[in-house]
């Protein structure tokens, strides 16, 4: 015997043969397993976490959005004078972090059980354990307290997600120096909380602890926060957060972080512009400088692969590795933004590529919608003004303040900020009037962005949007008005405001 036959001859514990094996059960892995099973394929899924749902559910989007909302309510309730102007009388608010974490843990378990029930209902076999390649079609699964066994699969979907990037000189101990994952499970509120990294994850966690009373400082090595954001939006976001009490140290690198005998963290910082170093003090430092594909433990080197193959050598039409077309990486292990919606769309594409029917194609993920869930929320989709200028695409823009919107003025009281007013900006192609980008600041940006994303991904024109009746009064009317302004190249089209 030789090759694969030789390997198989040493496999004493051979468990099962599947059409599809999915490694990882976050949003992408779950979607792939469901799609495959519903297409009539014998499917199994393996995940090493105690609860299904991946980092997205356990220590990512779900915990962060939950704590953002709860901390925002607390911040709002503290502003008694602002609320009493609307007629509501309140007792002083108090926030119990331990109770919040207990409720969050219960919520995560319940959502994990939803994943489990749906997979069971669709006859997907679930293994709780680790997975490692033995050869291109065989994977060893190790479950706690059990002898490892081998699973064979015709197709293998790799959806193992991502892990935080470590920083040289700043060792994460998850005590004083923590990851973003650990930050979302803290059961206390640090007095001085410093965050290394001004991306979306860092900013959202900054908002949580700032709302709860921590003195928050963000250290960012670049000259601006959120590098993929429209410049106007990024500048407005920074100003809004500064007005809420968050401090920013831009063009600044963390060189070293050490705790003294009293437990205080002493962080050596280097300003890239002045070239000067100085020491910053805090109680907790969170490292949030990005994430990288999580492939450790899969033993991909045993089949001649490395991390670059998952990023560079993938047929994006079928989500297939060029070397092994039956191995299909999806989600955070692939090139592009690390978003759940990207993972889900890639999962659908991967399963459809093996000849399965299902939903009619996948969405256009070239410009995925993005939301920063601070208060107010920041949302954007499509081209930025800088991107259009770089691509030499002629464009027109329309910008509308939400303060001019009837519905906006009937909603919850909000902190007044004389520097930045919530707005929506629409960018359209001057040649064919296609909607190229939409950028907004609003408490409900996550919901409003859906219609903007539809317009951008479907290639709708400004004329298409203007033909659609919008409910009144509604926040969405501001989107239509911004489109009309863009058509008129920023001059008022005399929009009639209904009473």
From Swiss-Prot:
It is found in: Cytoplasm. Its main location: cytoplasm. GO terms for molecular function: dihydrolipoyl dehydrogenase (NADH) activity; flavin adenine dinucleotide binding; microtubule binding; oxidoreductase activity, acting on NAD(P)H. InterPro entries: Class-I_Pyr_Nuc-Dis_Oxidored, FAD/NAD-bd_sf, FAD/NAD-binding_dom, FAD/NAD-linked_Rdtase_dimer_sf, Pyr_nuc-diS_OxRdtase, Pyr_nucl-diS_OxRdtase_dimer. FAD binds at residues 47-56. Pfam families: Pyr_redox_2, Pyr_redox_dim. GO terms for cellular component: cytoplasm; microtubule; mitochondrion; oxoglutarate dehydrogenase complex. Present with 6400 molecules/cell in log phase SD medium. PANTHER family: DIHYDROLIPOYL DEHYDROGENASE, MITOCHONDRIAL (PTHR22912:SF151), DISULFIDE OXIDOREDUCTASE (PTHR22912). This is Increased recombination centers protein 15.
């Amino acid at each position: 015997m030789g090759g694969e036959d030789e390997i198989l001859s040493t496999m004493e514990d051979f468990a099962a043969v599947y059409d599809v094996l999915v490694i990882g059960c976050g949003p992408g892995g779950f979607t792939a397993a469901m799609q495959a099973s519903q297409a009539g394929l014998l499917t199994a899924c393996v995940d090493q976490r105690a609860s299904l749902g991946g980092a997205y559910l356990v220590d990512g989007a779900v915990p962060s959005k939950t704590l953002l909302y709860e901390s925002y309510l607390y911040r709002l309730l503290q502003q008694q004078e602002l609320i009493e102007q609307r007629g509501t009388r309140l007792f002083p608010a108090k926030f119990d972090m331990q109770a919040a974490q207990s409720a969050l843990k219960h919520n995560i378990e319940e959502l994990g059980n939803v994943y489990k029930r749906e997979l069971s209902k669709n006859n997907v076999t679930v293994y709780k354990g680790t997975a490692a390649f033995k050869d291109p079609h065989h994977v060893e699964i190790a479950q706690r307290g059990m002898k490892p066994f081998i699973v064979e699969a015709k197709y293998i979907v790799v959806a193992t997600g991502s892990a935080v990037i470590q920083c040289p000189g700043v060792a994460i101990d998850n005590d004083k120096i923590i990851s973003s994952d650990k930050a979302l499970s803290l059961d206390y509120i640090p007095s001085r909380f410093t965050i290394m990294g001004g991306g979306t994850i860092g900013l959202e966690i900054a908002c949580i602890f700032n709302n709860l009373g921590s003195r928050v400082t963000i250290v960012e090595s670049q000259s601006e926060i959120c590098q993929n954001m429209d410049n106007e939006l990024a500048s407005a976001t920074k100003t809004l957060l500064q007005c809420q009490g968050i401090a920013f140290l831009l063009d600044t690198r963390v060189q070293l972080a050490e705790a003294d005998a009293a437990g205080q963290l002493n962080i050596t910082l280097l300003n890239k512009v002045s070239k000067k170093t100085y020491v910053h003090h805090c109680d907790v430092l969170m490292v949030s400088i990005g994430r990288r594909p999580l492939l450790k433990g899969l033993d991909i080197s045993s089949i001649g692969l490395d991390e670059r193959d998952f990023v560079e050598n993938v047929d994006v039409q079928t989500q297939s590795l060029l070397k092994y077309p039956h191995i299909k990486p999806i989600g955070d292990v692939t090139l592009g933004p690390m978003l759940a919606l990207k993972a889900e769309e890639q999962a659908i594409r991967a399963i459809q590529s093996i000849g399965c029917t299902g939903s009619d194609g996948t969405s256009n993920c070239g410009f995925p919608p993005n939301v920063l869930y601070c208060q107010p929320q920041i949302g954007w989709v499509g081209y930025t003004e800088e991107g259009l200028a770089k691509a030499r695409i002629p464009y027109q823009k329309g910008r509308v303040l939400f303060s001019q919107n009837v519905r906006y003025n009937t909603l919850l009281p909000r902190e007044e900020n004389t520097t930045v007013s919530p707005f929506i900006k629409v960018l359209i192609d001057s040649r064919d009037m296609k909607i190229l980008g939409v950028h907004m600041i609003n408490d409900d940006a996550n919901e409003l962005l859906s219609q903007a994303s539809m317009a951008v991904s479907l290639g709708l024109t400004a004329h298409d949007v203007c033909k659609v009746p919008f409910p009144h009064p509604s926040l969405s009317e501001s989107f239509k008005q911004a489109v009309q302004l863009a058509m008129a190249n920023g001059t008022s089209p005399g929009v009639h405001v209904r009473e």
